[in-house]
Amino acid sequence: MTKLGIALATAAAAFAVATPAMAQTTIPYQATYVEPVGGPNGSPFSCAPGTSCGSASISGIGHSDNQVVQFNACGFGCHVRTVTFADGATLVIRTEDQPSGFAFTSPGNSGSNGYIGFPAGDGNPQFLDIKETIMGGTGRLAGASGGGAGTVKLHGGVAIGSTSGTITLP
Protein backbone atom coordinates (compact mmCIF):
# COMPACT_ATOMS: atom_id res chain seq x y z
CA MET A 1 0.00 0.00 0.00
CA THR A 2 2.86 2.37 0.75
CA LYS A 3 4.38 1.80 -2.69
CA LEU A 4 1.01 2.57 -4.31
CA GLY A 5 0.67 5.79 -2.28
CA ILE A 6 4.18 6.90 -3.25
CA ALA A 7 3.49 6.11 -6.92
CA LEU A 8 0.24 8.10 -6.88
CA ALA A 9 1.88 11.06 -5.12
CA THR A 10 4.75 11.02 -7.63
CA ALA A 11 2.33 10.92 -10.57
CA ALA A 12 0.26 13.77 -9.13
CA ALA A 13 3.37 15.89 -8.55
CA ALA A 14 4.61 15.23 -12.10
CA PHE A 15 1.21 16.21 -13.52
CA ALA A 16 1.15 19.42 -11.48
CA VAL A 17 4.62 20.39 -12.74
CA ALA A 18 3.81 19.47 -16.35
CA THR A 19 0.60 21.52 -16.50
CA PRO A 20 1.02 24.85 -14.72
CA ALA A 21 -2.08 26.96 -14.25
CA MET A 22 -2.57 29.58 -16.95
CA ALA A 23 -4.53 32.53 -15.63
CA GLN A 24 -5.70 34.89 -18.36
CA THR A 25 -7.40 38.19 -17.76
CA THR A 26 -9.75 39.76 -20.31
CA ILE A 27 -10.62 43.41 -19.78
CA PRO A 28 -12.55 45.97 -21.81
CA TYR A 29 -10.55 48.88 -23.20
CA GLN A 30 -11.12 52.26 -24.75
CA ALA A 31 -8.29 53.77 -26.77
CA THR A 32 -7.58 57.22 -28.16
CA TYR A 33 -4.82 57.83 -30.71
CA VAL A 34 -3.85 61.42 -31.57
CA GLU A 35 -1.69 62.01 -34.65
CA PRO A 36 -0.83 65.40 -36.20
CA VAL A 37 -0.95 64.80 -39.97
CA GLY A 38 -0.62 68.22 -41.55
CA GLY A 39 -1.45 71.86 -41.65
CA PRO A 40 0.68 74.92 -40.97
CA ASN A 41 1.18 73.99 -37.31
CA GLY A 42 1.95 70.35 -38.01
CA SER A 43 5.20 70.62 -39.95
CA PRO A 44 7.98 69.70 -40.10
CA PHE A 45 6.89 66.14 -39.46
CA SER A 46 8.86 63.88 -37.17
CA CYS A 47 7.33 60.70 -38.62
CA ALA A 48 9.03 58.65 -41.31
CA PRO A 49 7.42 58.59 -44.78
CA GLY A 50 4.58 56.06 -44.97
CA THR A 51 3.83 56.39 -41.27
CA SER A 52 1.84 58.45 -38.82
CA CYS A 53 2.88 58.96 -35.22
CA GLY A 54 1.68 60.56 -32.03
CA SER A 55 0.28 59.60 -28.65
CA ALA A 56 -1.99 56.83 -27.39
CA SER A 57 -4.10 56.36 -24.26
CA ILE A 58 -5.48 52.87 -23.66
CA SER A 59 -7.64 52.35 -20.57
CA GLY A 60 -6.35 49.65 -18.27
CA ILE A 61 -2.97 49.69 -20.06
CA GLY A 62 -1.63 53.26 -19.93
CA HIS A 63 -0.56 56.35 -21.86
CA SER A 64 2.18 56.53 -24.49
CA ASP A 65 3.84 59.46 -26.21
CA ASN A 66 5.38 57.02 -28.70
CA GLN A 67 3.03 55.25 -31.10
CA VAL A 68 3.67 54.75 -34.81
CA VAL A 69 1.38 53.45 -37.57
CA GLN A 70 2.99 51.87 -40.64
CA PHE A 71 0.48 52.38 -43.45
CA ASN A 72 -0.34 49.37 -45.67
CA ALA A 73 2.09 47.13 -43.74
CA CYS A 74 -0.25 44.14 -44.09
CA GLY A 75 -1.93 45.05 -47.39
CA PHE A 76 -3.88 47.98 -48.81
CA GLY A 77 -5.92 49.56 -46.01
CA CYS A 78 -4.28 47.26 -43.42
CA HIS A 79 -1.89 49.06 -41.09
CA VAL A 80 0.29 48.04 -38.14
CA ARG A 81 0.35 50.27 -35.06
CA THR A 82 3.11 49.86 -32.46
CA VAL A 83 2.52 51.56 -29.11
CA THR A 84 5.56 51.82 -26.83
CA PHE A 85 4.95 52.63 -23.16
CA ALA A 86 7.31 54.36 -20.70
CA ASP A 87 8.29 51.03 -19.09
CA GLY A 88 9.43 49.70 -22.51
CA ALA A 89 6.43 47.40 -23.00
CA THR A 90 4.92 47.45 -26.49
CA LEU A 91 1.53 46.61 -27.93
CA VAL A 92 1.23 45.71 -31.62
CA ILE A 93 -2.18 46.30 -33.24
CA ARG A 94 -3.36 45.54 -36.78
CA THR A 95 -5.82 48.18 -38.00
CA GLU A 96 -8.07 47.50 -40.99
CA ASP A 97 -10.00 50.27 -42.74
CA GLN A 98 -13.73 49.52 -43.09
CA PRO A 99 -15.33 48.88 -45.55
CA SER A 100 -12.13 49.22 -47.63
CA GLY A 101 -8.75 50.95 -47.72
CA PHE A 102 -8.79 54.67 -46.91
CA ALA A 103 -12.59 54.84 -47.37
CA PHE A 104 -12.95 58.21 -45.65
CA THR A 105 -16.36 59.87 -45.76
CA SER A 106 -17.33 63.49 -45.28
CA PRO A 107 -20.65 63.92 -43.47
CA GLY A 108 -23.55 66.18 -44.31
CA ASN A 109 -22.93 69.25 -46.45
CA SER A 110 -19.22 69.62 -45.67
CA GLY A 111 -18.37 68.49 -49.21
CA SER A 112 -14.94 69.72 -50.25
CA ASN A 113 -14.83 72.55 -47.72
CA GLY A 114 -11.94 72.83 -45.30
CA TYR A 115 -8.37 71.63 -45.12
CA ILE A 116 -7.60 68.29 -43.50
CA GLY A 117 -3.84 68.12 -44.15
CA PHE A 118 -3.97 64.57 -45.50
CA PRO A 119 -4.22 63.25 -49.06
CA ALA A 120 -7.47 61.40 -48.30
CA GLY A 121 -9.40 64.10 -50.10
CA ASP A 122 -10.98 67.42 -49.40
CA GLY A 123 -13.67 68.07 -46.86
CA ASN A 124 -13.42 68.83 -43.22
CA PRO A 125 -14.00 66.62 -41.29
CA GLN A 126 -13.43 63.12 -42.69
CA PHE A 127 -14.40 59.88 -40.94
CA LEU A 128 -13.09 56.32 -41.34
CA ASP A 129 -14.39 53.20 -39.59
CA ILE A 130 -11.67 50.81 -38.44
CA LYS A 131 -11.32 47.32 -36.99
CA GLU A 132 -8.46 46.53 -34.58
CA THR A 133 -6.79 43.19 -33.86
CA ILE A 134 -4.25 43.02 -31.03
CA MET A 135 -1.40 40.95 -32.44
CA GLY A 136 0.81 40.77 -29.35
CA GLY A 137 3.25 42.74 -27.31
CA THR A 138 6.43 42.71 -25.27
CA GLY A 139 7.27 43.11 -21.60
CA ARG A 140 4.17 43.19 -19.40
CA LEU A 141 2.05 42.96 -22.58
CA ALA A 142 3.74 39.84 -24.02
CA GLY A 143 1.12 37.45 -25.37
CA ALA A 144 -1.63 40.09 -25.46
CA SER A 145 -4.57 39.39 -27.78
CA GLY A 146 -8.02 40.75 -28.50
CA GLY A 147 -9.53 43.45 -30.63
CA GLY A 148 -12.17 46.06 -31.17
CA ALA A 149 -13.49 48.70 -33.54
CA GLY A 150 -13.93 52.43 -33.79
CA THR A 151 -13.59 55.54 -35.92
CA VAL A 152 -10.80 57.84 -37.09
CA LYS A 153 -11.82 61.50 -37.32
CA LEU A 154 -9.59 63.63 -39.51
CA HIS A 155 -9.92 67.41 -39.28
CA GLY A 156 -7.73 70.47 -39.09
CA GLY A 157 -4.54 68.52 -39.74
CA VAL A 158 -5.07 66.08 -36.84
CA ALA A 159 -6.26 62.46 -36.90
CA ILE A 160 -7.99 61.24 -33.73
CA GLY A 161 -8.80 57.55 -33.50
CA SER A 162 -11.28 56.34 -30.89
CA THR A 163 -11.74 52.60 -30.43
CA SER A 164 -13.08 50.13 -27.88
CA GLY A 165 -12.93 46.39 -27.45
CA THR A 166 -11.38 43.74 -25.22
CA ILE A 167 -7.80 42.78 -24.51
CA THR A 168 -6.67 39.47 -23.03
CA LEU A 169 -3.44 39.36 -21.06
CA PRO A 170 -1.80 36.07 -20.08
PLM regions with names:
Residues A23-P170:
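Beta-strand-enriched cores of mature, soluble protein domains
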Residues T10-A11, A21:
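Cleavable N-terminal signal peptides
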